[in-house]
Amino acid sequence: MTLTFLDGNEGIARGAMAAGCSFFAGYPITPATSIYQQMLQLLPPTGGVCMQGEDEIASIGFCLGASMAGVKAMTATSGPGISLYSEQISFAIGGEIPLVIVDVQRLGPSTGSATKGADGDIQFLRWGNSGGLPVIVLAPVDAKDCYLLTMHAFNLAEQYRCPVFIASNKEIATTRESVDLDGCLPPEVVRRNPAPKDHSGHPFEPLEGELIPPFFPMGGHRLSRQTSSTHGPEGYITTDPAIIETGILRLKEKLHSGVDDFTFFDLDVQTEDKILLVVYGVTARAARTAVVDLREMGCKISLLILKSLYPVPEKLIRSAIKDKSQVVVIEMNHGQYVREIERLAVGVPVRFFGQMNGELISPESIVKEVTA
């Protein structure tokens, strides 16, 4: 076993390289800047490109262009930057452009505090696009998760032709720990699915029985079209209601139909439990300690750590909630993902504890909330 001492941001950079990333563009912003610095060291020696845009809008635009040309691309930012990314995120969704977007969250709103963490962007990542179509949001807990989930993020972006978010935060980004990268069983790398040379279809036309069209790279052997406007299979702008509805439903269904294939989680079940504790992100560290303390106090409790937030893994959550008398949700915000839990916990009381003051939620705070 060979241990590597790294933080979450380095885990993301290494995961990106292992997944085949060959293009990175970003604009410096705390606490995401070290991802850019890592990629600047890692990409050029392999023939990849790492560049700093003049601002966040340009940076994500560079990534979209690189991806449309056929290469795997990633960008990274924090709260103020993700707000500026919004229009281009919508373009990536509608244009079915594979892209990994890392949001190393910090305390908001607005500029907020660059050196304080939070999980305040969760709802923005889900709904911060015009049209409200579904997106994939993954939530690492530690540096190992950052490495593995980044690889999964690239695979999902390629497989489903969509932007994929990694919802990290300042504490995950800057916490250094020993990780056995060789022993953490990374997923098999998914390559881009280009349209075959004899493919007679259009740029946005899936093959028979499929929901995701093969990829027509810009500058490739086939004529390709791209637009941010509503379009039909040919890539031409359309105002035809039937064509628009068919396209929108396909964009929605391609993710919802595959959610069980990218549901990542840890579940610590106690026999005859009555309470389910639900957490995600760095708060999972405190929750693990709190669950140990609660069980020593005689509390029958299980712990669900969600590592894929959207599309909501409804089957998993409903199964975990089944036969519980109470659900407790803990978040580093004032209540964002708890709304999804409440929607699924029909007939089961849901309690919430949120904290957004720049400090980590402590195990003691969780114990106090559960036993109140």
Where are these regions (language model features)?
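Thiamine diphosphate
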Residues: M1-W127, P134, M151, K170, ...
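Flexible, low-complexity linker and terminal segments
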Residues: T2-N9, E158-A372
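Amphipathic, non-transmembrane alpha-helical secondary structure
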Residues: R14, S86, K144-Y147, M151, ...
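N-terminal cationic-hydrophobic initiation segments that often serve targeting/anchoring roles
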Residues: L43, S67, I93, R126-N129, ...
